[in-house]
Amino acid sequence: GLTSKLDYLQQLGVNALWISSPLEQIHGWVGGGTKGDFPHYAYHGYYTQDWTTLDANMGTGDDLRQLVDEAHKRGIRILFDIVMNHTGYATLADMQAYQFGALYLQGDELKKTLGDHWTDWKPGAGQTWHSFNDYINFSDKAAWEKWWGKKWIRTDIGDYDNPGFDDLTMSLAFLPDLKTESTAPSGLPNFYQHKPDTHAKAIPGYTPRDYLTHWLSQWVRDYGIDGFRVDTAKHVELAAWQQLKDQASQALAAWKGAHPDKKLDNAPFWMTGESWGHGVMQSDYYR
């Protein structure tokens, strides 16, 4: 994997590695492209489903620790790509595994159409990879509340609040928009009760923003991650990014204090954000 390439990267003069988000993504696929002519997987790391666990495709905690430690030995910092604006789409794989959402199919028709493992479905004659949506009852309010829950996201499904039309409340690419602006305690996402591998613990009074910044900064505290590249920065409140920066900075300082033999230097935590469509004019996103 990547760790085995560190010597080569060092020889090239690389001093920082910005890696795709290694956090757990949605499982399975959704229809890809406007025509649905291929299955689209969350290979890019932008459909995070659980901010407390690593995606199995990226390796284990030991693998990550080895990467960070070996990179630091070579003068290379590790940066995570991270997302707090949205989560991923609902997939057949996750609906079945975590018991949320509803289908129009029942009994023998369900088994005949989707089989024992729903994610094995493939489009038939006259169908595309988008056609799996035809089997899903998106209007069943109770069934879809078992997914994230209204306190966590806004989306055009079930009884969720509809997305807005501004940068902060819109549904980017029809993705569920996380309510990072909310001041209401949320509890954990509802489907996490069926997700035994999550490390998420309920914290009294925490909002979605509080959970997200806590979970992300924990990777810094546990592994010594040096920085974040923030995706979709303009779609999340600046106060949320400041909260994350503050917590991650404290976390890295704590990690360096606990691991003086592993730290690269005393440099503080570093963050940069993508504000799509922004020119070189001065603003809160560009100085």
Model-derived regions: residue spans:
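N-terminal structural segment of carbohydrate-active enzymes
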Residues: 1-77, 85-87, 92-95, 107, ...
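Short, acidic/polar
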Residues: 1-8, 201-222
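Loop/turn elements at helix/coil->beta-strand transitions in domains of secreted/extracellular proteins
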Residues: 10-17, 72-79, 223-228, 265-271
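Active-site-proximal helices and loops of the catalytic beta/alpha 8
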Residues: 68, 86, 101-102, 106-129, ...
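Intrinsically disordered, low-complexity regulatory segments
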Residues: 161-164
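Active-site cleft segment of glycoside hydrolase catalytic domains centered on the general acid/base Glu
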Residues: 176-205, 233-250
